[in-house]
Amino acid sequence: MGIIDFLLALMQDMILSAIPAVGFAMVFNVPHRALPWCALLGALGHGSRMLMMSAGFNIEWSTFMASLLVGSIGIQWSRWYLAHPKVFTVAAVIPMFPGISAYTAMISAVKISHLGYSEPMMITLLTNFLKASSIVGALSIGLSVPGLWLYRKRPRV
């Protein structure tokens, strides 16, 4: 894959991830003036995750680093635009939620309950459940840590 193809894929990924970020921002009743910034932050988060995954990181660590980036930028933008950081960050990380892994784990659990236990189905269930749980944990910790770092009142040492 050439560099042009990679950049086009990255741009496509960023544009397509900005759409659900704006959609969820509208569901969460974000002010209209903040909607473009939610879209930009969602695109930056998903694009940075794609960059890290293409550099060789796994999806869990890439998601953690991308959510750290989203949280840090969201805190800075909240200072500039006098809004709460969650206005920008929560809708921006929604496109990074692990829908396919969670869905596959859920379908595997339903199949096990209907058809009975089988080892391959249990492996599929556990693999996808742990992957989805790790990604959701990475998103929540990655969004929390910048606030803990940047709003700290006491000295670090």
Curated annotation (Swiss-Prot):
| Compartments it resides in | Cell inner membrane
Provide the coiled-coil residue spans.
Answer: none
* Any Gene Ontology biological process: succinate transport
Q: What is its main location?
A: membrane
Q: Which UniProt keywords apply?
A: Cell inner membrane, Cell membrane, Membrane, Transmembrane, Transmembrane helix, Transport
| Membrane-spanning ranges | 8-28, 55-75, 87-107, 129-149
Checking Pfam families in the record gives: ThrE_2 (PF12821)
Q: How does it sit in the membrane?
A: Multi-pass membrane protein
InterPro entries registered for this protein in UniProt: ThrE_2, ThrE_Dicarb/AminoAcid_Exp, YjjB
Q: Which GO terms describe its cellular component?
A: plasma membrane
Family membership noted in the UniProt record = Belongs to the ThrE exporter (TC 2.A.79) family.
How the protein assembles, per its UniProt entry? The transporter is composed of YjjB and YjjP.
Q: What does this protein do?
A: Involved in succinate export with YjjP. Both proteins are required for export.
Protein name per Swiss-Prot or TrEMBL: Probable succinate transporter subunit YjjB
